[in-house]
Amino acid sequence: MPEFLEDPSVLTKDKLKSELVANNVTLPAGEQRKDVYVQLYLQHLTARNRPPLAAGANSKGPPDFSSDEEREPTPVLGSGASVGRGRGAVGRKATKKTDKPRLEDKDDLDVTELSNEELLDQLVRYGVNPGPIVGTTRKLYEKKLLKLREQGTESRSSTPLPTVSSSAENTRQNGSNDSDRYSDNDEGKKKEHKKVKSARDCVPFSELASTPSGAFFQGISFPEISTRPPLGRTELQAAKKVQTTKRDPPRETCTDTALPGKGQTHKLAPGRSLFIPSESSYDRCVEKSSSPSSQREFAARLVSAAASPSLIRETTTTYSKDIVENICRGGKSRAQPLRAEEPGVSDQSVFSSEREVLQESERSQVISPPLAQAIRDYVNSLLVQGGVGSLPGTSDSVPTLDVENICKRLSQSSYQDSESLSPPRKVPRLSEKPARGGDSGSCVAFQNTPGSEHRSSFAKSVVSHSLTTLGVEVSKPPPQHDKIEASEPSFPLHESILKVVEEEWQQIDRQLPSVACRYPVSSIEAARILSVPKVDDEILGFISEATPRAATQASSTESCDKHLDLALCRSYEAAASALQIAAHTAFVAKSLQADISQAAQIINSDPSDAQQALRILNRTYDAASYLCDAAFDEVRMSACAMGSSTMGRRYLWLKDCKISPASKNKLTVAPFKGGTLFGGEVHKVIKKRGNKQ
């Protein structure tokens, strides 16, 4: 009778399967974990080494001994080839230096010598759902592990045989057990922390749109992150302590009056306000984040989270802690205006309490998922740039936001309380005519209105943020005469835009491309607004009556007038196409703003639901790609309108010129390069005409 191993775990998975098949043991369907085959080996093969009534069939050592020295299998003489190979495997396994010892066999384990992964594994074995183990939380978890080991609540029973009826369960469990550490394949030799990291790898969305035309943006992929597990006992206690430590409810912070538009509705109906300001409770927590350094910080945190989600776990709390501690050390006197309404509470006590809240939050890791935190900060900065401010649910969110509110409130110490009480300035409607101011003209008077100053400040803020995000440096123009003007932030004409303009100006008489397929509108609006207006019948009647009397008019003049009319019609068509594109981009941009607001609300209300927010951000990426392509189409239509108007002006100026019709046609359709109406072609024509004379 062949004798089998008492500890079959030393065999590889393939060897176990071959031994089971050789001894007529039915294997479960599909690929199973190694523990499954070990249990089958113990039940069907190892049990044959003993009488049927022998106890401890599934034990890993002889039944008569319980000491650790007798856990190794006893050599058996006279075994066959297969048993000899098994003993050879045992010998090789005993001398292998890369195998990790079984932590559960060590009763006198020193928790201080464990790595973060081993400490996490031990806590999981005791049924604890720990959070991230970093330098600030390791001592807490070491004490918890020692306490649990003293209570002796760890279950030392053998791994139960899982059911193999559900293929989905087998797929979920395959590759996630600890038996990979004891196998001889290459995957089993890898360290355990690599398996933990594989669950957090960045997986880009497959549905992301391609890179937009113009090479403005690079492809962006949002990683998929797993849902954060429920808070553990220590985290819940820390969260309760944070809530009880708060001494006052969150107050409305000072709003940035330089940024306009705290409204929520845009109305496109004629005669109504295009932007309606409103006073709501959502206008909170607006931080002054338009500086290049702060925007670069948000973008860097988002990129680092996408590249390595585990890195942001430590940098998030460190980032907030450094801001608060720097302000607490040097900004006591600066923050006094914000605390003026509470004379009974000293600034030092407030700062100390806020420091305790921040340190307790850092120790207990009461933070939202790293990627959600970075996305939320970045989206909030974009919303601040757009004048939306904070979103609903910000003040009633998780305690993590209290830390951010501390940073925002302390960083806004340069503002005055009176600014937050001032009503929003009224943005003038498009239908309103500005007051005339002396000889400066209506345009200058309109620019001096308070609303236009807000819009100009808003435009400067958006342009500065966009330039910083794209990494574009604005060159300062040289001072003109004795007047030194501050350089205004502005977008340069990118080479891709100039290329589109040059292509259209090379042949200004070409047929306009149709945009009806990509930007469709209703037939009624197309006929009334987008189509070139027809000449009234009454005017045509007058012209027909005057034609016989003008029969002596030169045919060249009539041809010039017709070409001029055609050029003006082409200009109208190009402008109508640009209007058609702009109407579509307006609605898509409004939808994009709503999607970003919805994603920010989801992240603020439930940070663990990052998947839904990422799906919304995926839609916003598609919308942004659409806007980029539409912008280039609008640039093309604008270039066509400029070329057509230039051709019309050429016909008008050449109408009475005494040159040949062929020369006129050549000059009117010559490529346009800007600067002068005819460019260098006029010199060639004049030179030829002089040579003929």
From Swiss-Prot:
Domain LEM: 108-152
Biased composition (Basic and acidic residues): 96-105, 178-190, 245-254
Coiled coil region boundaries: 557-656
Positions where Phosphoserine occurs in the chain: 59, 66-67, 79, 82, 155, 158, 165, 167, 310, 349, 352, 368, 420, 422
GO terms for MF: DNA binding; identical protein binding
Region (Linker): 49-107
Biased composition, class Polar residues, residue ranges: 154-177
Modifications the protein undergoes after translation, according to the UniProt entry: Phosphorylated in a mitose-specific manner.
Gene3D superfamilies for this protein: 1.10.287.3160, 1.10.720.40
Residues annotated with Phosphothreonine modification: T74, T153, T159, T163
One GO CC term on file: nuclear envelope
PROSITE patterns assigned to the protein according to its UniProt record, in alphabetical order: LEM, LEM_LIKE
GO BP term (any one): regulation of DNA-templated transcription
Chain positions with Omega-N-methylarginine modification: R85, R87, R329
Pfam families: LAP2alpha (PF11560), LEM (PF03020), Thymopoietin (PF08198)
Subunit structure: Homooligomer. Interacts with LMNA, BANF1 and RB1 and with chromosomes. Associates directly or indirectly with lamins at specific cell-cycle stages. Interacts with CMTM6.
The protein's role, per its UniProt record: May be involved in the structural organization of the nucleus and in the post-mitotic nuclear assembly. Plays an important role, together with LMNA, in the nuclear anchorage of RB1.
Protein family membership: Belongs to the LEM family.
Domain notes: The N-terminal part contains two structurally independent, non-interacting domains: LEM-like (also called LAP2-N or LEM-D) and LEM (also called LAP2-C or LEM-B). LEM-like binds DNA while LEM interacts with BANF1. The C-terminal domain forms a four-stranded coiled coil.
Name of the protein in question: Lamina-associated polypeptide 2, isoforms alpha/zeta
Lineage: Eukaryota, Metazoa, Chordata, Craniata, Vertebrata
